[in-house]
Curated annotation (Swiss-Prot):
Belongs to the RuvC family. It comes from Finegoldia magna (strain ATCC 29328 / DSM 20472 / WAL 2508). GO terms for biological process: DNA recombination; DNA repair. Binds 2 Mg(2+) ion per subunit. It is found in: Cytoplasm. Its main location: cytoplasm. PANTHER family: CROSSOVER JUNCTION ENDODEOXYRIBONUCLEASE RUVC. Its EC number is 3.1.21.10. It holds the Pfam family RuvC. The RuvA-RuvB-RuvC complex processes Holliday junction (HJ) DNA during genetic recombination and DNA repair. Endonuclease that resolves HJ intermediates. Cleaves cruciform DNA by making single-stranded nicks across the HJ at symmetrical positions within the homologous arms, yielding a 5'-phosphate and a 3'-hydroxyl group; requires a central core of homology in the junction. The consensus cleavage sequence is 5'-(A/T)TT(C/G)-3'. Cleavage occurs on the 3'-side of the TT dinucleotide at the point of strand exchange. This is Crossover junction endodeoxyribonuclease RuvC. The gene is ruvC. Gene3D superfamilies: Ribonuclease H-like superfamily/Ribonuclease H. Its cofactor is Mg(2+).
Length: 164
């Protein structure tokens, strides 16, 4: 199984590609799609869509796992990021990927074993599991790796949150 992990965003979209085969997990790539706040929103969304398509075409994942969005206060930011997330989902749908989403609590529970783990604990665990020399940077990429790991660990136990 090949998983595309996504940490949704408009300025920075974290992504990762993990392979899971014979109980072995291998990270093929992780990184970020970045857009400039100086660019018009339609241009930013178009760029994200194009870059997502390139990643999907290159790596041919089976599943796509998203971190569920959570916003506290800023409605304008929530709307803009939600629009970007819609574009990210659309690129996966157009490539016939199965879509799943996980809450931050589920991701922390799956990766660290504790749903209230802090960001640093999650990053250190990701580094250990995948035998990285250092924590993936930036944080958005590390989050995307954690999302993909959550999906892989969930698949072992048939604990998959298929997007409705």
């Amino acid at each position: 199984m090949r998983v595309l992990g996504i940490d949704p965003g408009i300025a920075i979209v974290g992504y990762s590609i993990l392979d899971y085969d014979n109980n072995k997990i291998k990270c093929l790539e992780y990184g970020c799609i970045t857009t400039s706040s100086k660019s018009a929103l339609p241009d930013r969304l178009s760029f994200i869509y194009q870059e997502m398509n390139k990643i999907i075409d290159e790596f041919q994942p089976d599943d796509c796992a998203f971190e569920e969005l959570f916003f506290n206060k800023n409605v304008k930011t929530a709307i803009t990021v939600s629009q970007a997330r819609g574009v990210e989902i659309l690129s996966c749908i157009n490539k016939d990927l199965r879509l799943y989403e996980y809450t931050p609590l589920q991701i922390k529970q799956a990766v660290v074993g504790y749903g209230r783990a802090d960001k640093r604990q999650v990053q250190e665990t990701v580094k250990t599991i995948l035998k990285f020399n250092e924590i993936p940077k930036p944080d958005d990429a590390a989050d995307a790796v954690a999302v993909a790991l959550c999906h892989i660990f969930g698949s072992k136990f048939k604990y998959l949150n298929e997007m409705k």
